[in-house]
Amino acid sequence: MNIVIGAAVSMEVIEGWIKQVNEEFGLTDKNQACLQHFAALKNYYIFIVESDFYAVLEPSVDIWGTREMHVVSYYIKPDKRNIRLFLKIQHKFEEISKAWDCKFLYQGSHLGDRLYSYLERNGYKVATMRKEIK
């Protein structure tokens, strides 16, 4: 897998993935906001960029010095979605987290119920709570 530290990823590559993902989910009106986000923060991210998928991870350290890895985003092209590739990506997340000496690996709340069930069976624990502010 092609692992790239933020600054080395071109905005053209990022823009291509943003357009594809947002088109699939009906979010093309969010393209510019997504581009601005990555332009501002890409130097802090770790990217896995392949022709069939991408992933974005963010290493961080909490106030007690505990290293953590956060899966900010990942996407697999619809015609390439299968359990084998999914497991390969999950394994790579763990490898990268270990290489960065992280104690915890977090994945976001946008994940579907089936994926949450799989992650729970493989050692993940619910770690965050979210409240929508209206």
Give the residues covered by each predicted segment.
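Short amphipathic alpha-helix that is part of the acyltransferase structural core
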Residues: M1-N31
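Short secondary-structure junctions
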Residues: I3-V4, N122-A127
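A conserved beta-strand-loop-helix scaffold within acyl/acetyltransferase catalytic domains
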Residues: T28-F47, Y54-G65
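Short glycine-aromatic motifs
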Residues: N43-Y45, R121-Y124
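A structural microfeature
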Residues: D52-F53, T128
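Short coil/turn motifs at secondary-structure junctions
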Residues: S60-D62, I76-D79, K134
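Acyl-donor binding region in acyl/amide transferases
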Residues: T66-G123
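Conserved catalytic-core motifs of GNAT/GCN5-like acyltransferases
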Residues: G108-S109, K125-K134
